[in-house]
């Protein structure tokens, strides 16, 4: 007699299947970044290649539920529990070593960033360095409701580090220092170096008290107004510190949350695994660059009849702002340590080419993980911020719709052993 199987809904199973190692509702362990977490299987795609499971991480918000390939899921048994504890212990030891290095590590990271961008001297080399690199900051966990605003131009109170000036680049504004990236359970870590390490993915940095210069995201319906003064009129000062916000202004600042679609989250994990664990690199120049993706999205919006002339202008301004952010942030905030040697080589070979014309979709996706924290320092009023986030979310939907084109794992290439030795 043939076995009667339950009907499939939307090509995934809600029961058991002979081709799967895990069943729905099973308690499992699952890799997320460098660590292993307790999880539960909610749904299964037995027909996928490889088989995929829809995972809920125990104790995490359901926003982190995601489809993962079978090779990231482990049976919940004593051996794997010990493996999980050992990885957590190793990660904790690394954190302690990093804390002991203190300012010496920060200076080393700053030197590495300067060397990686030193192929062309900056026109603003005489400008003063930002106090953000030397002033302690107060961090706050990422993630709260986004708020927004009216009209004006983007202004920030800053004496930020000057960045390398390059021909055809739209911005020479400085990149901010960031908090140590990590997995969702690592939100309480102290701020550290801006560079993304091998063991940690590029996620949103924590909020700081320092206002810093950033590219603007403006348009007919996306604009900004100046930040309030850092000192009150009733308390005059002879030498005001424009780069330091008042306690009231800092407390009133609202973090901006950009929701990454579930369909794109697993590409971030696959990206991390390919670079950090498998020691692969994304081929450069990318087959489809950030600039080309931006142009394709604009062409797509123009083809829609409901896109008015004014909306088209606003979309174009938002895309220009995203590209500016990408060019400014890539070198210091969007790279894994293993990619830095490749980055330095690219900077030597293409000193006058914008990074948005060299790097592609995977690095662009990393940008959106951090972009919310960057926008928290803008002076956008409620309506303007809402308009901006609407455009950003629509752009992410465009990436989802074309994910099979933009996020192919065939874009990753193997490197020779010499590169691996030098990168480590």
Curated annotation (Swiss-Prot):
Ranges of Basic residues composition bias in the record: 97-106
Modified residues (Phosphoserine): 119, 211
Compositionally biased residues, Basic and acidic residues: 107-116
SMART domains: CHROMO
Region listing for Disordered, in residue ranges: 88-243
Swiss-Prot/TrEMBL keywords: Chromatin regulator, DNA damage, DNA repair, Nucleus, Phosphoprotein, Transcription, Transcription regulation
CDD domains given in the database record: CBD_MSL3_like
GO CC entries: histone acetyltransferase complex; histone methyltransferase complex; NuA4 histone acetyltransferase complex; nucleus
An annotated GO BP: chromosome separation
InterPro entries (alphabetical): Chromo-like_dom_sf (IPR016197), Chromo/chromo_shadow_dom (IPR000953), MRG (IPR008676), MRG_C_sf (IPR038217), MRG_dom (IPR026541), Tudor-knot (IPR025995)
Residues modified to Phosphothreonine: 175, 183, 196-197, 235
Start and end residues of each Tudor-knot domain: 23-73
Location in the cell: Nucleus
Low complexity: bias regions: 122-165, 232-242
Reported function: Part of the Tip60 chromatin-remodeling complex which is involved in DNA repair. Upon induction of DNA double-strand breaks, this complex acetylates phosphorylated H2AV in nucleosomes and exchanges it with unmodified H2AV.
Oligomer and partners: Component of the Tip60 chromatin-remodeling complex which contains the catalytic subunit Tip60 and the subunits Domino, Tra1, Brd8, E(Pc), DMAP1, Pontin, Reptin, Ing3, Act87E, BAP55, Mrg15, MrgBP, Gas41 and YL-1.
PANTHER family associated with the record: MORTALITY FACTOR 4 LIKE 2, MORTALITY FACTOR 4-LIKE PROTEIN
Protein name: NuA4 complex subunit EAF3 homolog
Designated gene of the protein: MRG15
């Amino acid at each position: 007699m043939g076995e009667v199987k339950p009907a499939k809904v939307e090509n995934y199973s809600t029961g058991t299947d002979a081709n799967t190692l895990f069943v729905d509702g099973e308690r499992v362990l699952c890799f997320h970044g460098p660590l292993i977490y307790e999880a539960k299987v909610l749904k299964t795609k037995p027909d996928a290649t490889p088989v995929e499971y829809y995972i809920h991480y125990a104790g995490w918000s359901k926003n982190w539920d995601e489809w993962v390939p079978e090779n990231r899921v482990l049976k919940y048994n004593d051996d794997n529990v010990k493996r999980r504890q050992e990885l957590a212990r190793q990660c904790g030891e690394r954190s302690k070593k990093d804390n002991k290095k203190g300012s010496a590590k920060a200076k080393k990271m700053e030197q590495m960033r300067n060397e990686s961008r030193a192929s062309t001297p900056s026109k603003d080399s005489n400008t003063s360095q930002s106090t953000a690199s030397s002033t302690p900051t107060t961090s706050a966990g990422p993630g709260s409701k986004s708020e927004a605003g009216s009209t004006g131009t983007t202004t920030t109170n800053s004496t930020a580090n000057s960045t390398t000036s390059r021909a055809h680049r739209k911005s020479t504004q400085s990149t901010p220092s960031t908090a140590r990236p990590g997995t969702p359970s690592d939100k309480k870590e102290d701020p550290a170096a801006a560079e993304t390490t091998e063991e940690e993915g590029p996620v949103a940095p924590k909020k700081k008290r320092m206002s810093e210069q950033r590219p603007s995201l403006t348009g007919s319906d996306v604009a900004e107004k100046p930040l309030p003064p850092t000192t009150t009129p009733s308390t005059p000062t002879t030498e005001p510190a424009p780069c330091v916000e008042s306690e009231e202004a800092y407390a009133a600042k609202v973090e901006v949350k950009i929701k990454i679609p579930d369909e794109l989250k697993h590409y971030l994990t696959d990206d991390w695994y390919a670079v950090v664990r498998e020691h692969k690199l994304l081929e450069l120049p990318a087959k489809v660059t950030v600039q080309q993706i931006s142009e394709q999205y604009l062409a797509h919006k123009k083809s829609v009849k409901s896109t008015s002339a004014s909306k088209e202008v606003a979309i174009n301004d938002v895309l220009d702002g995203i590209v500016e952010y990408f060019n400014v942030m890539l070198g210091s905030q969007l790279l894994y340590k293993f990619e830095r040697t490749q980055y330095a080589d690219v900077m030597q070979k293409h000193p006058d080419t914008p990074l948005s014309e060299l790097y592609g979709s995977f690095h662009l996706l990393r940008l959106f993980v951090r972009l919310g924290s960057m926008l928290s320092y803008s002076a956008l009023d409620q309506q303007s911020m809402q308009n901006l986030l609407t455009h950003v979310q629509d752009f992410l939907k465009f990436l989802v719709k074309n994910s099979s084109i933009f996020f192919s794992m065939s874009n990753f290439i193997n490197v020779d052993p010499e590169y691996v030795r030098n990168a480590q």
